[in-house]
Amino acid sequence: MVEGAEKVATELIGRLEQAWNEADGRAFGEPFSADADFVDIRGEHHSGQEAIAAGHQAIFDSIYRDSSVDYELIQARELWSDVILAHATGVLRVPSGPLAGEHSAMQSLVLLRGGDGWKIAGFHNTLVASH
């Protein structure tokens, strides 16, 4: 039984938010497992913690320079004793450039507990449709 699935998910999402807002790709990649899968907002698949960290540093240095994000956990539930499925929403604020503006997205995360604690094994980011 996972104790506090919401607490685990909130902590990991909070680390992502802090790393994004500090424009720190290395710190953004840290909560991910070494073999994590990340599907970005454009549907591109990134494999592994190093690729996730490097890819985020690249966007922090270019199209998302000086941007900020706010994540909010929507739900988290235990699938197995060492597996949590979580959903969050995020609001990205980009001050300038070709992607300037506010963008809302929903994230699905698979969290795994291993020898080094809880890590993000899967992350899928999807734009929220505007109505």
Where are these regions (language model features)?
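A solvent-exposed, acidic/Ser-Thr-rich amphipathic alpha-helical stretch
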Residues: E6, L12, G25-D82, L99-E102
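A short hydrophobic beta-strand element
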Residues: S81-L92
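A short, polar/proline- and glycine-enriched secondary-structure boundary/capping micro-motif
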Residues: S96-L99, S130-H131
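Beta-strand elements of well-folded, non-transmembrane domains
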Residues: L92-S96, L111
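Short beta-strand edge/turn micro-motifs at domain boundaries
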Residues: S104-H131
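Short helix-adjacent coil turns
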Residues: L16, A23-D24
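Residue-level recognition of conserved beta-strand positions in structured domain cores
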Residues: D40, H87-A88, G122
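A detector for short, charged/polar N-terminal pre-domain segments
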Residues: M1-A5
